[in-house]
Amino acid sequence: MTMNSFERRNKIIQLVNEQGTVLVQDLAGVFAASEATIRADLRFLEQKGVVTRFHGGAAKIMSGNSETETQEVGFKERFQLASAPKNRIAQAAVKMIHEGMTDPTHVIWTQA
């Protein structure tokens, strides 16, 4: 999918609005662009006040107008955020866990 920066940034805005968060790695795959290009796009969009960046991605800016937006992020949202890296961590960790060992974290829970 070949796009100019204007088209790509508009599509990124659309994805952020639909999904709430996006990851650099995922966007690079979607747009067949380098991660450096996507990071530059996210920096540009953050400077314009459209998104807020976090390590590895960007999120929709909450208006603070609704009660749900001002609440702390819940388990479901944390679970979905950066799920691919969490799955890779869990797959590595599961090799170190033996019968009878337990760990209450949600990273390990993904392997259940």
From Swiss-Prot:
Give the annotated DNA-binding region, as residue ranges: 22-41
| Family annotation (SMART domains) | HTH_DEOR
Question: What GO molecular-function term can you cite, just one?
Answer: DNA binding
Q: Where is the HTH deoR-type domain?
A: 5-60
Do the record's keywords include Transcription regulation? yes
Keywords on record: DNA-binding, Repressor, Transcription, Transcription regulation
Q: Does the keyword Repressor apply?
A: yes
Q: Which domain of life is it from?
A: Bacteria
Which InterPro entries does the annotation name? Carb_Metab_HTH_regulators, DeoR_HTH, Tscrpt_reg_HTH_DeoR_CS, WH-like_DNA-bd_sf, WH_DNA-bd_sf
Q: Which purpose does this protein serve, as stated in its record?
A: Repressor of the gat operon for galacticol transport and metabolism. In K12 strains the operon is constitutively expressed because this gene is inactive.
Q: What is this protein called?
A: Putative galactitol utilization operon repressor
Tell me the organism.
Escherichia coli (strain K12)
